[in-house]
Amino acid sequence: MEIATVVKANGGCEADRRRLRRLRCSVKDYDWGKIGSDSLVYRVYAANSDYEIDPTRPYAELWMGTHESGPSYLEDADGSNGVTLRSWITENPKSLGNRVLEKWGCDLPFLFKVLSVARPLSIQAHPDKKLAKKMHKAHPNLYKDDNHKPEMALAYTQFEALCGFIPLQELKSVIRAIPEIEELVGSEEANQVFCITEHDEEKVKSVVRTIFTLLMSADADTTKKIVSKLKRRLHMESQERQLTDKERLVLKLEKQYPNDIGVISAFFFNYVKLNPGEALYLGANEPHAYLFGECLEVMATSDNVVRAGLTSKPLDIQTLCSMLSYKLGYPEILKGTRIRPYITRYLPPFEEFEVDLCDLPSGASTVFPSVPGPSLLLVLQGEGRMSTEASADGISMGDVLFVPADTEIHLRSSSDLKLYRAGINSRFLFPL
């Protein structure tokens, strides 16, 4: 795509610094990704890249940012990959803005992704900063960086996930209804849950930690026997009653990951179904597993994952069980807040990031005001034109652009346009 750049004569280098930078991005072909053109990641990557793309492979994640495990590159004038975004930022630190530079140094503090999930990801959690530093020092090959990884998933399609521990009353009902849990952890330990109340938060955490750790630590032979028993019982009962959503999910998980302890542990987690345009966020040390659908995900710049089930990748069950916060309750679902015509903001309680969704009808226009921090823009639908004081660019599906700090953006659509902006959390940039 041709890019017409007009640098004002009186603006010089400062105007050029604020010019939008078109990016080429990295993809991951994890086996849980959707295949070929069924994958949103594939379709975005096909539009974003000049490479020959294999339509028979899974396309799981598109990474936009500076993490070394999946770097983005500036697009050169001839359309080829230039320097990495991180290298360019190192040479142009003012593009981050002073507050961001002082807080996080010369790097983008967030990582933006597109996910296309065909089958469940692992049951996992991400460490806080203290644990991340310890894990990275001890096992740098497994844990690639020393940062924490709070994150937010914004549904693009219907999106399903397991997220956080269910409320105490629901957990009591689960222990009563699923005898296989008691078989795995022992009746004395399982029955502890009936002796606690929500008012004693520390006791609740202690009991849930004990039960969950015993469950996840069961040996392979016992797990295989109990999962098979659970499967047989649910199939028999399905002839006489309608299974719950969670029970149907557990049978589906068992088909995909037979004999996996993650099948039974799913009963402990909230089963969340997001509609397009809804989001959930996850702090450090919170268990979760994405199940199906497509989403935009933004997180602190990290790739640290501790896994404990529903995967063929290496597990670290004891670390996961010891690191979890064991907070109980349904997660907050963000619907977004309309901040100006056509723009909805999703603002999680993390300094590193927020996401704006711009749904711009054909022929309409809007403005992203200048902010003292960097942004990444991703176009997922339609065409239009984007202008700043330094440039005027045509945009279309698959375009990814880096926006330097202090850059006001004017948008006009020539067809229905859907665009996402990931940036620094406004509460950090504009403290009260």
From Swiss-Prot:
It catalyses: D-mannose 6-phosphate = D-fructose 6-phosphate. InterPro entries: Man6P_Isoase-1 (IPR001250), Mannose-6-P_Isomerase (IPR016305), Pmannose_isomerase-type1_CS (IPR018050), PMI_typeI_cat (IPR046457), PMI_typeI_hel (IPR046458), RmlC-like_jellyroll (IPR014710), RmlC_Cupin_sf (IPR011051). Keywords: Acetylation, Isomerase, Metal-binding, Zinc. Its cofactor is Zn(2+). Induction: By light (at the protein level). Down-regulated by dark (at the protein level). Down-regulated by DCMU, an exogenous photosynthesis inhibitor. It holds the Pfam family PMI_typeI_cat. Zn(2+) binds at residues 124, 126, 151, 288. Constitutively expressed in both vegetative and reproductive organs under normal growth conditions (at protein level). Transmembrane segments: none annotated. GO terms for molecular function: mannose-6-phosphate isomerase activity; zinc ion binding. Binds 1 zinc ion per subunit. It is an enzyme of class 5 (isomerase). The keyword Thylakoid does not apply. Inhibited by EDTA, Zn(2+), Cd(2+), Co(2+), p-chloromercuribenzoate and L-ascorbic acid (AsA). One of its GO terms (biological process) is carbohydrate metabolic process. The active site is at residue 307. Optimum temperature is 52 degrees Celsius. Optimum pH is 7.5. Belongs to the mannose-6-phosphate isomerase type 1 family. Phosphomannose isomerase involved in the synthesis of the GDP-mannose and dolichol-phosphate-mannose required for a number of critical mannosyl transfer reactions. Involved in the ascorbic acid (AsA) biosynthesis. Required during the endosperm development. This is Mannose-6-phosphate isomerase 1. It comes from Arabidopsis thaliana. The lineage of its organism: Eukaryota, Viridiplantae, Streptophyta, Embryophyta, Tracheophyta.
